[in-house]
């Protein structure tokens, strides 16, 4: 990407990924003794994506990193993870591991995962939040996704949003996450520096469990570890369910640890009780696309139907009061509360029905930390906001073209069908272009027209005031298949 002035704003962050057209994985005889990739699952497969394009546009001011947890997150961890210009290799001793905020519940999770089947976990009991150097238990192989030979990371902040992408082409997987923060970016920052590592840790535990377990399913005996070099277990239903459970456990753990941190620091920062974040995670492992979401960010698949026409398939659920299913769930869970939805928001405060954080709508003690009109009256039966995610796994087929992963700001202006139509049209005529940046350009043009501005007038409106015309918008486009093309990704702030 050329440096210089951009008509849609100043481009401060630019990253993108282009897959090589080669076999993914390395031969077993080339792996040193004791070397494990993808937690022991030695994948010999071709990547099911060809490139990644991403972009983010700020409507809110992009503030300094959070100062929670004694400032360690904002001053040490996030700077080591953010890569504003390109994907870069994960350092051998990532600063990410300096945050041992998850240690107590990680040890509990290790015990429960080793002794239980693949069932949805309950949130772990809150433990004390503390910071120290992190070291995984010796019984779990250190490294996993972080130690794969070609793991690369990119990400950054735009307004209250955070975007994160981690890729290992050699193992054929891609992790993408959008944390759409609200009432501040503390929760989004917390997720950016903890959730990926927590997912990695739980996947290590899954590997350990599968190595110790023998399963008899439909009469077929699977020796899960005695012959692992000859079997790709990432394609088994047992593994798929295990991955979904890992994502679920990691999210519950993040919620527990974040709210514990809020309780510890709310005396000095009472605003933390209202801070929250939507969560959208996609994990592409070989041909399987795992999706987890809380809130109203979306993953939308563009796929060809039987008539060879491109159609949009939403892989996520919209967790808002506008969703009749969600509203009905809320009402059924709080039968004794006649005033749940006020003015189209939960207790008149929040439109999303599921999110991480936002403790004042979950615990009476946290609501009491707020003063005056900020405090929610008649908090009769909390929690009113759920942390139970929607999850699914989609098997990538030859009919699947690309996936749009985006915060709700995109869908304030475009329907799912309009978004995939714009991307398809752009990529068809600009095979080496940047579809995510193009979507943002179209969004800004539409926002300007809607407000009665010229494009230049809108882009000259400073962040903060620009929030009147569009939200923070984060977009990633994952191009599926093995077509070779050049991609870029941009963050506008």
UniProtKB/Swiss-Prot annotation:
It catalyses: O-phospho-L-seryl-[protein] + H2O = L-seryl-[protein] + phosphate; O-phospho-L-threonyl-[protein] + H2O = L-threonyl-[protein] + phosphate. Mn(2+) 2 binds at residues 180, 408, 471. Its cofactor is Mg(2+); Mn(2+). It comes from the Eukaryota. This is Probable protein phosphatase 2C 40. GO terms for molecular function: metal ion binding; protein serine/threonine phosphatase activity. It holds the Pfam family PP2C. Its EC number is 3.1.3.16. Belongs to the PP2C family. Binds 2 magnesium or manganese ions per subunit. Mn(2+) 1 binds at residues 180-181. The keyword ATP-binding does not apply. Gene3D superfamilies: PPM-type phosphatase domain. Disulfide bonds: none annotated. Keywords: Hydrolase, Magnesium, Manganese, Metal-binding, Protein phosphatase. InterPro entries: PP2C, PPM-type-like_dom_sf, PPM-type_phosphatase-like_dom. Residues 145-480 form the PPM-type phosphatase domain. It is an enzyme of class 3 (hydrolase).
């Amino acid at each position: 990407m050329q440096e210089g002035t951009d008509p849609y704003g100043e481009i401060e962050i630019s990253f993108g990924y282009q897959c090589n057209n080669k076999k993914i994985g390395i031969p077993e005889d080339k792996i040193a003794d004791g070397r494990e990739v993808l937690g022991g699952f030695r994948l010999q497969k071709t990547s099911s994506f060809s490139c990644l394009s991403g972009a983010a546009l700020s409507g809110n001011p992009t503030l300094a990193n959070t100062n929670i947890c004694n400032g360690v997150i904002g001053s040490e961890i996030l700077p080591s993870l953010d890569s504003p210009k390109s994907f870069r290799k994960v350092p051998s001793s990532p600063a990410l591991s300096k945050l041992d905020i998850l240690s107590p519940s990680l040890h509990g999770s290790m015990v429960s995962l080793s002794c239980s089947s693949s069932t949805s976990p309950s949130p772990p009991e809150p433990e004390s939040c503390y910071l120290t150097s992190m070291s995984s238990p010796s019984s779990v192989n250190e490294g996993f996704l972080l130690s794969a030979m070609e793991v690369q990371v990119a990400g950054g902040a735009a307004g209250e949003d955070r975007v994160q992408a981690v890729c290992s082409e050699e193992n054929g997987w891609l992790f993408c996450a959008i944390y759409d923060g609200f009432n501040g970016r503390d929760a989004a920052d917390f997720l950016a520096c903890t959730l990926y590592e927590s997912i990695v840790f739980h996947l290590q535990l899954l590997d350990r469990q599968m190595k110790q377990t023998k399963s008899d399913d439909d009469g077929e005996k699977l020796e899960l570890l005695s012959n692992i070099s000859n079997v790709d277990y990432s394609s088994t239903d047992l593994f798929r369910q295990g991955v979904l459970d890992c994502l679920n456990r990691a999210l519950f753990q993040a919620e527990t640890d974040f709210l514990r941190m809020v309780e510890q620091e709310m005396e000095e920062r009472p605003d933390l009780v209202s801070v929250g974040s939507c969560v959208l995670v996609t994990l592409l492992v070989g041909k399987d696309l795992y999706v987890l979401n809380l809130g109203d960010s979306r993953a939308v698949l563009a796929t060809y139907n039987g008539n060879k026409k491109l159609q949009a398939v939403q892989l996520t659920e919209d967790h808002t009061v506008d969703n009749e299913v969600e509203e009905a769930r809320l009402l059924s869970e709080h039968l004794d509360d006649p005033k749940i939805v006020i003015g189209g928001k939960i207790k008149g405060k929040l439109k999303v029905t599921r999110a991480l954080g936002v403790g004042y709508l979950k615990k009476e003690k946290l609501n009491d930390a707020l003063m005056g009109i900020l405090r929610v009256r008649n908090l009769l039966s909390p929690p009113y906001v759920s942390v139970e995610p929607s999850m699914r796994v989609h098997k990538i087929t030859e009919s699947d073209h690309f996936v749009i992963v985006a915060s709700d700001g995109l869908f304030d202006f475009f329907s799912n069908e309009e978004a995939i139509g714009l991307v398809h049209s752009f990529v068809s005529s600009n095979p080496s272009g940047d579809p995510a940046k193009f979507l943002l350009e179209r969004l800004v043009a539409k926002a300007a027209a809607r407000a009665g501005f010229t494009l230049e007038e809108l882009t000259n409106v400073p962040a903060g005031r620009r929030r009147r015309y569009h939200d923070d918008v984060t977009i990633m486009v994952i191009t599926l298949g093995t077509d070779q093309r050049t991609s870029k990704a941009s963050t506008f702030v």
